[in-house]
Amino acid sequence: MEGGTGRCLCGNVRYTFQGVPNWQAHCHCESCRRVTASPFTSYLGVSHGSWRWTGATPATFASSPGVRRHFCPSCGSPMAYEGDRWAHEIHFFAATLDDPAAFRPTAHVNWNEHLPWVRLADGLPVRYTPRRLTGDEDMGPFLNLIREAFAYMDGIVDPPSSVHALTGAALAEAARAGEVWVIDELSAPLACMVLTPKPGRLYIGKLAVAAGHHRKGLARQLLAHAAIRAKALGLPVLEMQSRVELTGNHAAFEAMGFVRAGETAHPGYDRPTSVTFRRPVP
């Protein structure tokens, strides 16, 4: 789709835009569902300066701090979304397009909030919104996720993984002292990571993905969120470590833009036991 026009039900509010949309996707977040009374919504993002209202000016509702939702004051049709998080663009509802068949979604976003009775077979990738743990939740499910994800290391790495000594209380403390982020779906944890700010860098530990959910981009989504957090904290580098024996992990980290930055040894060992990887924050 390159350029287009759209309107509300009664035709009072209209818009036009030029160029290819920045993105096109389906959103499953609760607030978008409620504002449209639909199981999910579909949007296209258009940069400011590339669009304009051509009919009546829509009414605006501030649904939450920093969020403005535009709708027709005559027929009530939802028209568009604007938010401080996306200050450079407006999001038009795809169903308001005069030619909605031209819409070409590329992903489902906020999938962790999707309704359990929504079954879609379009093959599009799903994107989740990571959730930060406060430390007051039951850490059992997240601890089990980490233990199960790291279990394959048993008998491979020397010394044994520190996961064996990890407790729910320690994970809760990590959430309070640092940051623990999870991706879950219908209350079931799918992936998690622990972020620890260090001088000049943000350390990523306990990156884990649940069995049956590999190769779905969950680790990449968490690492992308880690970059967002690093930027917010003023830290220019992401850092991870992997045991020297786990060459598959090394290749995976390098494929995601990390480079080897050094080696370290556990206490009592006269050889390197871990490899440090780093990636600059864009």
Each predicted region: which residue ranges?
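A short Gly-Trp-Pro
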Residues: 1-129
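Hydrophobic adenine-recognition pocket in adenosine-nucleotide-binding enzymes
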Residues: 32, 207-209, 242
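Conserved catalytic-core motifs of GNAT/GCN5-like acyltransferases
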Residues: 83, 239-242, 254, 259-275
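Short hydrophobic/aromatic beta-strand or adjacent loop that forms the aromatic wall/cage
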Residues: 89, 106, 178, 272-276
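Acetyl-CoA-dependent GNAT
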Residues: 136-212, 223-225, 229, 233, ...
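Glycine-rich phosphate-binding loop
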Residues: 213, 217
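Conserved GNAT acetyl-CoA-binding A-motif
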Residues: 230-242
